């Protein structure tokens, strides 16, 4: 077992967040080290679009390099985050004895990052907001490729249920 390990990784104060719209998110961690006088003397942050690359120290999106610092909150300095993209990140730290320790891989996913990236269309019933009966909306579509993952963004003032292929999604 490692004596020192970076844990509790957060991006903008959230664990593995989805839909962040901050081009410069804050990445933070805690140092798990019970030894007396324990401290971090340096850190390195790796950010990648591939978890294996991040795990193998390949930060093709960002590699901070080794920074001599006890800082545990770092603002992502680059301007290269793309909308609707999942990023994987980890942090390496060096302890008071110069030993390197590595965090587990965490992730964050960007949102629209600006209204110019919005491609959806609102679905509504064009009735007065005070119209009482609850409308049902149905959208039928076929995909051209096999779906690897998908996300539905739903905005309602009250209750909703989402079904895909006849199966209820969520609670």
Regions found by a protein language model. Give the residues of each.
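Short beta-strands within extracellular/lumenal beta-sheet-rich domains
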Residues: 131-143
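Low-complexity, Pro/Ser/Thr- and charge-rich linker/hinge segments at domain boundaries
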Residues: 109-132
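Structural beta-strand segments of beta-rich domains
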Residues: 23-27, 137, 148-150
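Predominantly extracellular/luminal cell-surface or secreted proteins
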Residues: 14, 32, 46-50, 94, ...
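Aromatic-lined ligand-binding clefts that engage carbohydrates, nucleic acids, or primary amines
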Residues: 141-144, 148-166
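Extracellular acidic, Ser/Thr/Pro-rich low-complexity tracts
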Residues: 31-37, 95, 143-145, 156-158
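Recognizes extended acidic, P/S/T-rich segments that occur
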Residues: 31, 38-86, 92, 96-102, ...
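Pro/Thr/Ser/Gly-rich low-complexity, intrinsically disordered linker/stalk tracts
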Residues: 2-35, 107-114
């Amino acid at each position: 077992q490692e004596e020192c390990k970076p844990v509790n990784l957060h991006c903008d104060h959230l664990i593995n967040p989805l839909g962040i719209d901050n081009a410069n998110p804050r990445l933070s961690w805690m140092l798990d080290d019970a030894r007396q006088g324990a401290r971090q003397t340096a850190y390195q942050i790796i950010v990648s679009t591939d978890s294996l690359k991040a795990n193998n120290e390949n930060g093709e999106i960002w590699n901070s390099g080794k920074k001599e610092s006890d800082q545990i909150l770092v603002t992502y300095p680059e301007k290269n985050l793309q909308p609707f993209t999942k990023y994987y990140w980890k942090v390496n730290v060096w302890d008071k004895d110069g030993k390197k320790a590595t965090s587990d891989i965490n992730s964050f996913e960007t949102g629209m990052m600006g209204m110019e990236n919005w491609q959806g269309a609102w679905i509504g019933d064009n009735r007065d907001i005070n119209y009482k009966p609850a409308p049902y909306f149905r959208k039928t579509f076929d995909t051209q490729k096999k779906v690897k993952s998908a996300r539905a963004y739903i905005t309602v003032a009250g209750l909703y249920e989402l079904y895909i292929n006849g199966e209820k999604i969520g609670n």
